[in-house]
A protein has these predicted regions:
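Hydrophobic alpha-helical targeting segments used for export or membrane insertion
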Residues: 17-21
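Disulfide-bonded cysteine-rich modules in secreted/extracellular proteins
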Residues: 35-45, 66-76
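Bacterial signal peptide processing site
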Residues: 28-30
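C-terminal motif of bacterial Sec signal peptides marking the signal peptidase cleavage site
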Residues: 23-26
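Bacterial N-terminal signal peptides that target proteins for export
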Residues: 2-15
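A residue-level marker of the well-folded mature domains of exported/periplasmic proteins
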Residues: 33, 56, 72-455
C-alpha cells in the first residue's frame, strides 16, 4: 500500500470517527446533522514528518476539530440530562496578525529634495493609502547600510525601502540574512523571496526636457550637472542629449560636469564652469535640488529631476522630469500586507505613470509646451523610442545602428555619452573620512509631500 494511500486512509478514518461521535446520535433521533467544524493541519508521513510538494511547500489538509470532555471548576465531568458526558470542540488559538512598519534608507538628506523628495511623496502616500506607520534614516553611507537596517528593525520596521541604487548589492545581501524582513530596492537588480527591486525609464521624460532645452537656449550651448551615482545616469543624460538633438541636430552642443550631490562647493564650481562655457540652460540630475536653487540665483534657466520645480525656481525653471514612486510602492507594500507578495523586478515608464513631467513654465519660449507635448504623447503611446539609431558616442563610434532600438536592459548598462556631448569635466573629490548617518530615526514630513497632477 502506498504512503499517500495510507495517509489518505488515516485522515478519512479520523473524519469518520469524529462524524460518528458528533452527528450519529442526532441522526438516530431524526434531528438534522450537526456540521463538524474543521481545522487545517500539515499532512505527515508514517514517521510524523511533514509531507512537501514539488515546490518544497508543506502539504496541508482539513480534519475535524477534536472533542474535549467538559468539566466543572473542580475538575468533575459535566453530564447532560440523561447522565451522558458533555463534550465541546477544542478552541483554536487566534492567528496573530502581523503589524507592518515601513522604514526608508536615504543616502542623502530628506531636505535635499530631488530623488529623496520623490520618495518622501511616496512615504506620505503609503500612510494615507495603507494606514501604515513609516520612518526613515538619512545620509547613510553604503558601508553603513547594514547598521541602518538593524536600527530600523529594532524600531519595529519589517519592510525596508532602499532609496538609492548605491545600496542595491547591500540590500540583496541583507535580504539573504533577514528572512523576517521585506526589502524594496530602488535600482533594477536581483530579486529574492523577500526582495523586490524596481526602477524606471526616466530617460523618456529627460528626452522631452532635452527638446524643451533646445527650444529655449539662445547660446546653443546647454549644460548638464550630474552625480555619477545617480540611477542610470548615462541613460538619463543621453536621453536628454538626444532630445536636444531632435531640434538642434548637428548644432547640438552639450557640456557635462560631474559633481557629488553632498558637496555644495563642487556643485557651485560645476555650475559656474558651465556658465563660463556659455551655457544658458542647465539640466541637473542629482540627489539634491541645490543645483536648481543655485542656477536660479545665477539667473540661468534650469531643468531638473524635481517634482516641485515651480516652488524652488519659479522664475527660472523650464520643466522637470521625476519619478512617481507612490503607485508602485503602495501596490508592493499592499501585496506584502495581504500575503501575496510576488517580486518581479518592476520597471515603469511614461505610460505607467512611474516617470512624469513637470508642467512647462509660462515664462518659457512660446511653443515650448506644444512641441514637447507632441513628443511626450508619442513616447507615452509607444510610437517613439528614445534610443533608436543611428547613435554615435563622443568618439564617433556607432553604438546603435540605424533603424535599431536599444532594449531597456541595454539602456540600463550604458556607460558612454552621445556625440552631441562636446566636453566633460569632473569636480568630484575623494573624501577620506566621509560624514555618514548618526542613525537618528525620523518620521516627520516636509511641507510639500504631494506630487503635481499629471499634465
Amino acid at each position: 500500500m502506498s504512503g499517500w494511500f495510507k495517509k489518505a486512509k488515516n485522515i478519512f478514518a479520523v473524519m469518520m470517527t469524529a462524524a460518528c461521535l458528533l452527528v450519529l446520535p442526532g441522526c438516530q433521533n431524526g434531528e438534522p446533522e450537526e456540521e463538524v467544524p474543521m481545522k487545517t493541519v500539515p499532512v505527515t508521513d508514517e514517521e510524523g514528518n511533514p509531507v512537501t510538494d514539488d515546490k518544497g511547500e508543506t502539504v496541508m489538509t482539513e480534519v475535524p476539530l477534536e472533542t474535549i470532555a467538559v468539566t466543572d471548576e473542580e475538575g468533575n465531568p459535566v453530564t447532560d440530562e440523561n447522565g451522558e458526558q458533555v463534550y465541546e470542540y477544542e478552541e483554536l488559538p487566534e492567528e496573530e496578525k502581523t503589524v507592518y512598519k515601513v522604514g526608508f534608507v536615504y543616502s542623502g538628506y530628506v531636505a535635499d529634495g530631488a530623488t529623496n523628495g520623490a520618495f518622501e511623496v511616496a512615504r506620505a502616500q503609503i500612510g494615507r493609502s495603507l494606514g501604515l506607520e513609516t520612518c526613515y534614516v538619512e545620509n547613510v553611507l553604503v558601508s553603513q547600510f547594514p547598521e541602518a537596517v538593524s536600527t530600523l528593525k529594532d524600531d519595529g520596521c519589517n519592510i525596508i525601502v532602499s532609496c538609492s541604487p548605491k545600496y542595491a548589492s547591500s540590500a540583496f545581501r541583507e535580504n539573504k540574512n533577514s528572512t523576517d524582513t521585506y526589502f524594496i530596492s530602488f535600482g533594477v537588480a536581483e530579486t529574492g523571496a523577500h526582495l523586490d527591486s524596481f526602477g524606471g525609464e526616466l530617460y523618456q521624460t529627460a528626452n522631452v526636457c532635452g527638446l524643451a532645452a533646445a527650444h529655449n537656449t539662445k547660446s546653443n550651448t546647454i549644460g548638464v550637472i550630474a552625480d555619477p551615482g545617480e540611477y542610470n545616469v548615462y541613460g538619463v543624460i543621453d536621453g536628454f542629449a538626444l532630445g536636444v538633438a531632435e531640434l538642434m541636430s548637428a548644432k547640438a552642443d552639450i557640456r557635462v560636469n560631474w559633481a557629488w550631490s553632498n558637496s555644495k562647493s563642487e556643485i557651485e564650481e560645476a555650475v559656474d564652469d558651465l556658465i563660463a562655457q556659455g551655457c544658458d540652460v542647465i539640466m541637473s540630475y542629482m540627489e539634491t535640488d541645490y543645483p536648481v536653487r543655485y542656477c536660479a540665483d545665477k539667473n540661468v534657466k534650469v531643468i531638473a529631476n524635481c517634482y516641485n520645480m515651480p516652488e524652488i525656481a519659479p522664475d527660472n525653471y523650464i520643466s522637470g522630469y521625476f519619478f512617481n514612486f507612490s503607485t508602485h510602492l503602495v501596490d508592493v507594500i499592499r501585496s506584502i500586507v495581504n500575503d501575496n507578495f510576488n517580486p518581479d523586478g518592476y520597471s515603469g515608464d511614461v505610460a505607467s505613470g512611474m516617470v512624469r513631467l513637470v508642467n512647462f513654465n509660462e515664462n518659457s519660449e512660446k511653443g515650448t509646451g506644444d512641441i514637447c507635448k507632441t513628443l511626450y504623447d508619442y513616447i507615452k503611446a509607444g510610437n517613439a523610442k528614445v534610443f533608436t539609431g543611428e547613435i554615435k558616442d563622443t568618439d564617433g563610434q556607432v553604438m546603435v545602428e540605424k533603424g535599431q532600438s536599444m532594449t531597456f536592459e541595454n539602456i540600463q548598462k550604458i556607460n558612454w555619452l552621445v556625440q552631441s556631448v562636446r566636453k566633460t569635466g569632473s569636480f568630484t573629490e575623494i573624501t577620506d573620512n566621509p560624514v555618514g548617518s548618526d542613525f537618528s530615526i525620523h518620521s516627520e514630513f516636509a511641507d510639500s509631500t504631494t506630487a503635481p497632477a499629471e499634465n
